[in-house]
Amino acid sequence: MNAQELRDKTPDELRDQLAALKKEAFNLRFQQATGQLENTARMRSVRRDVARVATILTEKAAAAAATE
């Protein structure tokens, strides 16, 4: 997912996506701890996606506060 696609989404959609990504990250950590994780690179990409979504949410909140 790229940042431009995320900027086109509403804050509610971004919050939903952030929750889903955090849940996936939790499941991946659990799989790694039990030795079931096959694609370890997925953990890195999910962690970066979480950061990307959180950054866009912060940008949108700052923009909304600036217009008020």
From Swiss-Prot:
Any GO MF annotation of the entry: structural constituent of ribosome
InterPro entries in the record: Ribosomal_protein_uL29, Ribosomal_uL29, Ribosomal_uL29_CS, Ribosomal_uL29_sf
Bridged cysteine pairs (disulfide): none
PROSITE patterns: RIBOSOMAL_L29
Domain of life (superkingdom): Bacteria
Gene Ontology BP annotations: translation
GO cellular component: cytosolic large ribosomal subunit
Keyword list, A-Z: Ribonucleoprotein, Ribosomal protein
Family listed: Belongs to the universal ribosomal protein uL29 family.
Protein name: Large ribosomal subunit protein uL29
Organism (species): Dinoroseobacter shibae (strain DSM 16493 / NCIMB 14021 / DFL 12)
Gene responsible for this protein: rpmC
